[in-house]
Amino acid sequence: PDMIFHAFLIKYAEIAIKGKNRYIFEDALVDQIRHVLKEVDGEFSVVKERGRIYVYADSEFDYDETIEALKRVFGIFGICPTVVVEDKGYEELSKEVVAYVKEMYKDEPKTFKMDVRRAKKSYPMTSMEMNAQLGGDVLDSCPNMKVDVHEPHVMIHVEVRDKIYLYS
């Protein structure tokens, strides 16, 4: 991809893991991820954060090789290439989201739905307000995109934490 991804959000099955055993599973998964990434050119950090596992690229890396390595880890069911941006307020976030959509989907006609989650509750807008506002910003800037909240081609995820994570 042309876009510069700095991280990967790792999704894993949580169905059978509740309570005390969950951290054992997560720690084993983190160890396994670290192990497969040793074979990949590049430096990575693997971090558990509030029920998520992130793989951060700390150097240049081979995108395809990294994805292939992560696919070999048992227990992972999703690998989301993620753009991580500093939280510099709504205006900057909006610019980043619009740039992301333009880069990822060029001029292809697509329907989309925004999915904003705020782990950082101190953020001045609610998730609902951000969904509406960011969706409007994308519509204004990307004439090829249309909203479809029921069956969108694309879900554009924005997670507001200490930093902001964009993926789709």
PLM regions and their residue ranges:
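RNA-binding accessory domains that recognize and position tRNA/RNA substrates
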Residues: 2-168
